[in-house]
C-alpha cells in the first residue's frame, strides 16, 4: 500500500509542510506569512494558508493525486487520549469556532481536511497538546475549585518515547519512561505502559521555568501581584506565558545568545541557566517518584537538548534515576507522518473524535 503523506504544521507566522514516502522525508518547506495574512480570524487564515500551500506544492510539481493521506498538527480540542484521530465534522467545528481555545495549530486539522476532501483522501491529526491520560490522583490539588490539567508537548514526547522503544525492541506499552521536552516551554512527563500518567501543564504555569514561561511561582506572592493593580489580566497571563522565564530576567529567550554571554563571563546569565537546569532536574526527580523509582530511561528532547552545557547540568543531578538518553530537536512533521503510518500499517487503530474515553474510564494502576 502506498504511504505518501502530506504533513502540515501551522505556526503563528508560518506554515511548515512536508512530503513523506513512508518514514522517508522527500520534501519540506517553511512558508512565511505576512502580518495581514495571519491577523484575521481562523476562517480567513484557513483560506489564505490553504491557497499558499497548494501554490507551493504546484510550483514544486508535487503530484497531489499520489497522496495517500494528509495530517495536520492537532489544535486546542477537548481532552483526548493519545493517538491518531480522523478529522470529522465535530472536530472541524471545534477547531474553527475555537470552542476550546484559539491557536494557530487549530488550522492543522482544518487545512488537512479541506485539502483531503478535494482529493477524496483521509485527513488526520496526531497527539495534540490536549492529550490527557492523567491518573485521578494526579489531578487533585489543595483547592476543590482547582484541578490540574494536561497540556504538554504530547506530539514530540510520544514520538521520541516510541522511537526509543522501537530502537530497543521493547513495546512502548511495556516501558516506564520520563520524557523532558525542553524548548520555549518545558514539560516533563511520566510515561507508564504507553500512557502519560502525570505531566506538568506547560501552558498555564506549572513546572520548571523556561526561556519564555514562568513555570511554577510562589502562590502567595503571585496572588498579591494579581491584586496589586500593577497588571491587568491579560498582562498577567503574558507574564506567565510569553514574557516569563529567561526572557524576563535576561531580555532574550535565545539559548545560543545566553550561552555566549555565559562564555563571556556573565554571572547572572550563568546562574539563571543553572537554575533552569536545576528546576528541570527537580521535575524529573518528581516524576521518578510517580513511577515508584522504577525508570527504564530518562529522555531529554526538544531544542534545548542540543545544549551540552544544559544537559550536563541536568544529568549531574539525575544520574541516579536511570539511563539518560538525548534525542534533541522536535521533528514535528516526522512525528505527524509516523502517527499516520502506524494507522496505515494497522499498528494502531484510528480514533474518532467525540468517541474517546474519559480519564476516569481510561485510568490504570500505577504499580
Swiss-Prot record:
PROSITE patterns: ACETATE_KINASE_1, ACETATE_KINASE_2. It holds the Pfam family Acetate_kinase. Gene3D superfamilies: 3.30.420.40. It is an enzyme of class 2 (transferase). The gene is buk. Belongs to the acetokinase family. This is Probable butyrate kinase. It comes from the Bacteria. NCBIfam families: butyr_kinase, PRK03011.1-5. GO terms for molecular function: acetate kinase activity; ATP binding; butyrate kinase activity. It is found in: Cytoplasm. One of its GO terms (cellular component) is cytoplasm. CDD domains: ASKHA_NBD_BK. Coiled coil: none annotated. One of its GO terms (biological process) is acetate metabolic process. Keywords: ATP-binding, Cytoplasm, Kinase, Nucleotide-binding, Transferase. Its EC number is 2.7.2.7. InterPro entries: Aliphatic_acid_kin_short-chain, Aliphatic_acid_kinase_CS, ATPase_NBD, Butyrate_kin. It catalyses: butanoate + ATP = butanoyl phosphate + ADP.
Amino acid at each position: 500500500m502506498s504511504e505518501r503523506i502530506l504533513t502540515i504544521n501551522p505556526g503563528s507566522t508560518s506554515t511548515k509542510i512536508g512530503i513523506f514516502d513512508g518514514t522517508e522525508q522527500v520534501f519540506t518547506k517553511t512558508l512565511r506569512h505576512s502580518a495581514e495574512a495571519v491577523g484575521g480570524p481562523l476562517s480567513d487564515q484557513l483560506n489564505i494558508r490553504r491557497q499558499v500551500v497548494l501554490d507551493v506544492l504546484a510550483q514544486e510539481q508535487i503530484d497531489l493525486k499520489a497522496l495517500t493521506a494528509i495530517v495536520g498538527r492537532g489544535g486546542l480540542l477537548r481532552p483526548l487520549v493519545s493517538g491518531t484521530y480522523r478529522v470529522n465534522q465535530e472536530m472541524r467545528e471545534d477547531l474553527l469556532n475555537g470552542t476550546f481555545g484559539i491557536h494557530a495549530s487549530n488550522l492543522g486539522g482544518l487545512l488537512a481536511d479541506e485539502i483531503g476532501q478535494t482529493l477524496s483522501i483521509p485527513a488526520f491529526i496526531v497527539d495534540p497538546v490536549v492529550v490527557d491520560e492523567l491518573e485521578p490522583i494526579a489531578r487533585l490539588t489543595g483547592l476543590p475549585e482547582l484541578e490540574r490539567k494536561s497540556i504538554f508537548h504530547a506530539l514530540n514526547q510520544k514520538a521520541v518515547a516510541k522511537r526509543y522503544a522501537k530502537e530497543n525492541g521493547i513495546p512502548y506499552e511495556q516501558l516506564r519512561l520520563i520524557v523532558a521536552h525542553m524548548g520555549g516551554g518545558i514539560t516533563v512527563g511520566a510515561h507508564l505502559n504507553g500512557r502519560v500518567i502525570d505531566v506538568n501543564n506547560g501552558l498555564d504555569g506549572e513546572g520548571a521555568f523556561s526561556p519564555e514561561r514562568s513555570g511554577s511561582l510562589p502562590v502567595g506572592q503571585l496572588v498579591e501581584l494579581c491584586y496589586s493593580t500593577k497588571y491587568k489580566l491579560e498582562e498577567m497571563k503574558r507574564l506567565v506565558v510569553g514574557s516569563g522565564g529567561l526572557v524576563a530576567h535576561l531580555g532574550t529567550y535565545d539559548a545560543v545568545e545566553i550561552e555566549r554571554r555565559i562564555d563571556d563571563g556573565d554571572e547572572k546569565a550563568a546562574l539563571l541557566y543553572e537554575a533552569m537546569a536545576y528546576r528541570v532536574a527537580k521535575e524529573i526527580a518528581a516524576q521518578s517518584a510517580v513511577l515508584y523509582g522504577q525508570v527504564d530511561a530518562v529522555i531529554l528532547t526538544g531544542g534545548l537538548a542540543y545544549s551540552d552545557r544544559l544537559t550536563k547540568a541536568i544529568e549531574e543531578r539525575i544520574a541516579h534515576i536511570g539511563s539518560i538518553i538525548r534525542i534533541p530537536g522536535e521533528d514535528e512533521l516526522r512525528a505527524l507522518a509516523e502517527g499516520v503510518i502506524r494507522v496505515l500499517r494497522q499498528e494502531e487503530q484510528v480514533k474518532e473524535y467525540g468517541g474517546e474515553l474519559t480519564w476516569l474510564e481510561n485510568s490504570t494502576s500505577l504499580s
